[in-house]
Regions:
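Alpha-helical transmembrane segments
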Residues: 1, 62-67, 126-130
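N-terminal transmembrane-helix/juxtamembrane module of multi-pass inner/ER membrane proteins
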Residues: 1-39, 70-95
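Membrane-embedded catalytic cores of phosphoryl/pyrophosphoryl-handling enzymes
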Residues: 28, 43-44, 57, 82-158
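Polybasic, low-complexity association/targeting segments
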Residues: 38-62
Length: 158
């Protein structure tokens, strides 16, 4: 029988945080920052102005759809984030946890970019980035494993 506590309990957070170190903290904070909206907006602007206007517009639509879907899902499920004692960052954050917006947007944005570029090395790079952004959210204690997996799943659908 599957134990739902694996997805929405603190076991995954505790397992990752058992390796806590200032270096890992900094590394995972950097990966989380790569999943912030302002990074995506900057990349979209650079793409639009420097490379390909059509791709920049498409990227905007893809991310906008993902953001609306994430908001709707968070409001629908209304699930809390992990307790603040597990959080390395955002200790006072009261936003909803499921699904992880960082994981969802990473899958949506980097997955779309990988499909557009169609190069093996970019696909590997983008998949690794998606994985590390999701993992960072668990390590930093701001999401449960289930939040991140839900974000990845909803990212695939947006």
């Amino acid at each position: 029988m599957f134990d739902v506590d694996i997805l929405f309990g603190t076991e995954a957070i505790e397992a990752l945080q058992s390796a806590l170190s200032p270096t890992l903290d900094l590394l995972f904070i950097l990966f989380t920052l790569l999943g912030e909206d302002y990074i995506y907006m900057s990349l979209i602007a650079i793409t639009y102005w420097c490379f390909n206007k059509r791709a920049g517009v498409q990227m905007s639509y893809v991310l906008l759809i993902s953001a609306y879907l994430n908001y709707w899902l968070k409001m629908s499920f209304n699930m809390d984030k992990p307790p603040s004692e597990y959080r390395i960052i955002l200790k006072d954050d009261i936003s909803h946890g499921f699904p992880s917006g960082h994981a969802q947007n990473a899958v949506t944005f980097w997955g779309w970019a990988g499909l557009k570029l169609r190069k093996a090395w970019t696909s590997i790079l983008f998949f690794t980035l998606i994985f590390l952004i999701g993992l960072s959210r668990i390590y930093l204690g701001v999401h449960y494993l289930g939040d991140v997996l839900g974000g990845c799943s909803s990212g695939l659908s947006s």
